[in-house]
Amino acid sequence: PIEPNDYVLNFQQTEHAAWLCMIGNLKKWKEGTLKREMTVKGQPITLTATRGECHGTSHWVDFRWDNPEITFADILEVFGELPIPPYLNRDTQESDKETYQTVYSKIKGSVAAPTAGLHFTPRILDTLKEKGIDLEELTLHVGAGTFKPVKSEEIEGHEMHTEYISVSRGTIEKLIAHDGKAIAVGTTSVRTLESLYHIGVTLLKNPDATEEELHVRQWQPYETAEEAANITSVKALQAILDYLNHHKMETLHTSTQIIIAPGYDYKIVCAMVTNFHQPQSTLLLLVSAFVKGNWRKIYDFALGHDFRFLSYGDSSLLIP
């Protein structure tokens, strides 16, 4: 989202919203404004889309419609289509709205489901609670760049996408109470939790940092590794809690471009539940960094025992 850049506010917009969009068959959209008449919530509207400047592989697109009672979320419900993985080789079905979604999802904004969470049913969640296992929820709006393969020979040549995260005060407090450690469900949770540590490091250096300054840059963890060497996860998390207290905030909202690759030193995640990922993906780099040199052994075992890969595939619990 660009105008406004908050997901919730953008979905609530009436008459106008702007996004950075990946556009298929771009050559067919020479110039000018596209127009479509449609019916939303029983009311006829005219929707226009104007293509703006290019930002890498995306374009600024300005959406406008002529009914102030219709929100952008209403338009997406009618005009949009659930983006299921392309390797399924089929069109989206109505049932996907339920099956390609976690049972605990609440906030709209991701372009893909956090598929490690698909394995968790209400019964499993209840069983975990009965065993005294604390469950906390956080938000990372998965960006389209998560599907972008690593094509460069060197990891330095790959540019990570920016994703927006939200973490509540209660979750920060729970993490501190558990010595700054957690089991992450899915790589989305991993990226969010590890980003928290580096946000805390930023706040320890600059307690008055703005929301923009809290953004975790792609190579930030590696650039600050030496100065952050003696900062524990609890200390970093406490800095975030102090920041929330000072600004009388209940939720931390910021963004991350973190890339987790071999050589990364995990700070908060002590175990992770994750599916099996495809070659040339940043997700496989993340797993490799976590299990060190054992990722080939793990994946050879999965292949040798006919495990299913990717979104609707089997899962694993990784403990380094």
Stretches found by the model and what they are:
Residues 1-320:
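Surface-exposed, charge/polar-rich loops and edge strands
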